Regions:
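Composition- and surface-driven signal marking solvent-exposed, interaction-prone regions
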Residues: 161, 240-242, 255-257, 288-289, ...
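Active-site lining segments that contact anionic ligands and/or coordinate catalytic metals
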Residues: 143-145, 222-226, 246-248, 268-273, ...
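Flexible, glycine/charged-enriched surface loops at secondary-structure junctions
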Residues: 169-172, 189-195, 207-219, 255, ...
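Conserved PLP-enzyme active-site core in the AAT-like
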Residues: 1-210, 231, 276, 284
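A common structural junction motif
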Residues: 247-251, 300
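PLP-dependent enzyme catalytic core of the Aspartate aminotransferase-like
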Residues: 198, 263-340
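Conserved small-domain helix->loop->beta segment predominantly found in fold-type I
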Residues: 182, 193, 197-242, 251-268
Length: 340
């Protein structure tokens, strides 16, 4: 929908490269990315600071200036956000440069929508984004789905891009569940989002103390729900994703900056990505992250038999059988006056 509203086929857009945290939906045609292959956009990558694990503001300003003045082909859209999203992106630092070039700003909040709703991440619309796309089923813990939000000046365009341009129907059966999830975010979101980030930082520290190379140590590892780990000293991400799953520990293999240059492929990259939203929702706190880190270490570093680790994970998990940050009963949900 964002592409339909803000661009035409053949336009230029800026986004993160996938090894730098970008999502396939913003990828180039030659990599089967949605932006290039489906909408026909020419994708230019944001310059990226690998040490800071974020967009390089100064180099981005220089790149946009060159696109405008020398190449005479300014971007029409700048897409912030991604699938590896450790720190808030520099929207407010780049909004003037991007808008001055005649481009619109979109922000992919699929992974961090719950943190934004909880007031613990950046506020992209108020920092200058023209539209925000999001998932309703990640850190925002509702049924699977998505949404695009914006201020009123783009509202009608987004509605028309949604129907009839891109969709003909939506899943009505999920709306009630989403409404309850949104109400729970209003009631519990601040505490929930804060605990997620606290747990992620603690998990990063615990993994670091056990010898794993956790990215962005000098910045406290993360300001989101995600922790990124370079495991090339011991194994590769695709192999360990499978091994950890066999041990009942679910992580994602993750392309990291430098993987492509090193000849690694997205099916077996150099990293893993770990999120803390699910374990937070079942009641885990900062103090439990050392045990979670130990399970991961046993598989990756110690090369313990996943079956044995699985038994220990199951025993540990028995202590967390309740969903937190939610209404205790249907009555609580239906009587929640803030959504009336």
């Amino acid at each position: 929908m964002v592409y339909t509203v803000f661009t035409n086929p053949g336009d230029r857009m800026m986004a993160l490269a996938i090894p730098n945290g970008g999502h396939i939906s913003t990828g180039r045609k030659e990599f089967s990315g949605t932006a290039g292959a489906v909408h026909g956009l020419e994708v230019e990558y944001f310059p990226f600071d690998r040490k800071e694990m974020n967009i390089d503001v100064d180099k981005t300003k220089q790149k946009i200036a060159k696109m405008v003045t020398e190449e005479k082909n300014a971007p029409k859209l700048a897409m912030f956000g991604g699938s590896l999203f450790l720190f808030p992106h520099p929207v407010k630092e780049l909004v003037e440069t991007i808008h001055s070039a005649g481009a619109k700003i979109a922000y992919d909040a699929a992974h961090v929508a719950g943190l934004i709703a909880g007031g613990r991440f950046q506020d992209p619309l108020r920092e200058g984004a023209d539209a925000v796309s999001l998932s309703t089923h990640k850190t925002l813990f509702g049924p699977q789905g998505g949404a695009v939000i914006s201020f009123e000046n783009y509202g009608e365009q987004i509605k028309k891009a949604t129907f009839p341009s891109n969709t003909s129907n939506h899943h009505l059966h999920s709306l009630a569940g989403k409404a309850i999830a949104f109400a729970e975010m209003l009631e519990f979101g601040k505490e929930y989002a804060g605990q997620i980030i606290e747990n992620a930082k603690a998990l990063g520290q615990a993994l670091h103390e056990r010898g794993l190379t956790v990215l962005a140590e000098h910045k406290g590892f993360t300001e989101s729900h995600q922790v990124a780990v370079d495991i090339t000293k011991y194994a590769l991400g695709g192999d360990m994703e499978k091994a950890l799953e066999s041990a009942n520990v679910i992580v994602n293999r993750q392309l990291l900056p430098g993987d492509i240059q090193a000849g690694r492929h997205y099916t077996n990259p150099g990293g893993i990505r770990i999120g803390t939203s699910e374990i937070t929702r079942i009641g885990m706190k900062r103090s439990h992250m050392s045990e979670v880190a130990e399970f991961i270490k046993r598989v990756i570093i110690n090369k313990d038999e996943p079956r044995k680790v699985k038994e220990d994970v199951a025993a540990f998990r028995k202590g967390f059988q309740k969903v937190h940050y939610c209404f205790e009963s249907a009555k609580d949900a239906y009587e929640y006056i803030k959504i009336r």
